[in-house]
Swiss-Prot record:
The gene is rplS. This protein is located at the 30S-50S ribosomal subunit interface and may play a role in the structure and function of the aminoacyl-tRNA binding site. GO terms for cellular component: cytosolic large ribosomal subunit. This is Large ribosomal subunit protein bL19. It comes from Idiomarina loihiensis (strain ATCC BAA-735 / DSM 15497 / L2-TR). GO terms for biological process: translation.
Amino acid sequence: MAKVSQSIIKALEEEQMKQDLPEFAPGDTVVVNVKVKEGNRERLQAFEGVVIRVRNRGLHSAFTVRKVSNGEGVERTFQTHSPLVDSIKVKRRGAVRRAKLYYLRERSGKSARIREKLS
């Protein structure tokens, strides 16, 4: 019985997953368009920054984007397959040697730069 219910849950999760997502990795600069509801109207808000973390868990996948706004570091975590995430666009590929770029939190200016991946 457990295997049957697991397969049903897996089928339902795969049905809800988005198929049109670009491949991105930590170090990439992305623009995430998020649906924001203000009162009775809905608009798109763009959030551009460096991906510092990717969590691959099927339907529960998430990624964290960091940007510096007015001298203040802002991090936002998005659920990859959320209906609130309208689109993800990769602007620049970054060459990094780590899966989690938490060290960028302590850095600013030139030391926080990421080399561009040459491919």
